[in-house]
Design a protein with these regions (language model features):
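Alpha-helical transmembrane segments
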Residues: 1-16, 68-83
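Alpha-helical transmembrane segments of integral membrane proteins, especially early/N-terminal helices
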Residues: 5-11, 35-47, 79, 110-115
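Membrane-interface helix-loop junction between the first two transmembrane segments
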Residues: 19-38
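A generic, lipid-embedded transmembrane alpha helix
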Residues: 42-62
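Interfacial loop-to-transmembrane junctions
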Residues: 95-119
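Juxtamembrane boundary at the C-terminal end of a transmembrane helix
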Residues: 124-132
Length: 132
């Protein structure tokens, strides 16, 4: 029972992670992979922070869920929270007259760090919320 469960959770988590990375990079207005290949540290920092911000609650869901289906459902919640975090920050900055994607595309490291840090912070809060 132990080894099959291990592989089920591992493969489920990896599938959710790959799906998150793919969807996040498709939903954001800038093109993370192209920017990262070009050496854009702001894009790498923002994208890396969002990945960590997703995997923190994914870990919590894996550790605290009562079943595999419960884990997957909480993983989907974590997915949605991270996507909403990016778009919430984007909307907030737009109201300040700034384009988040433009700053990241232009390699402004401060904005990449801001996105990455907020993504991790929200991920930690999300993970703690899953410890019921």
């Amino acid at each position: 029972q132990g080894l099959p469960s291990f592989f089920a959770y591992l493969l489920g988590a990896l599938a959710l992670l790959v799906a998150f990375m793919y969807c996040y990079s498709r939903l954001t207005p800038h093109h993370e992979w192209a920017l990262i290949r070009a050496g854009n540290a702001a894009a790498a920092t923002a994208y890396g922070g969002s990945i960590l911000g997703f995997t923190l609650p994914l870990y919590s869901a894996m550790a605290h869920s009562i079943s595999y289906i419960d884990f997957i459902l909480w993983g989907v919640v974590a997915f949605g929270v991270q996507i909403a975090t990016f778009f919430g920050l984007k909307l907030f900055l737009r109201r300040q007259g700034e384009s988040l994607s433009q700053h990241i595309t232009e390699g402004h490291q401060a904005y990449g760090t801001l996105v990455g840090s907020i993504s991790i912070a929200v991920g930690l809060i999300n993970a703690a919320s899953m410890t019921w």
